[in-house]
């Protein structure tokens, strides 16, 4: 939904969790009058269900990080890297070392555009602390020949 705030004319969200998908639909409905944009929520499992995102320019995602289930993010990342899009933005654990090699396998270049601490509220049963923080990196994947974001623009974000 954040893409609406920066001018996207069409936003397609893919969510596997039925409760999260319902929240996304409600939020789309709430924001409908504020933005002249089309929003779609697809409730599906990437890698299992048939999903058509052929009209998408940019993918923005926060995949499972594979902390509880090793390689849980792999099918989602592979799906994104196989799409014909201009860029892919991924929020992921700063500890992840597999993103760059995987992206390169699919012909993508990568740059980290933001590093920060991310607050993790105890949302799931495996969250044992009342509230925790983890280091994250926001990655931008782009095709070779496509330029990186100029360092001055990244510095302005900090």
What are these regions (language model features)?
Residues 1-158:
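Class I S-adenosyl-L-methionine-dependent methyltransferase catalytic core
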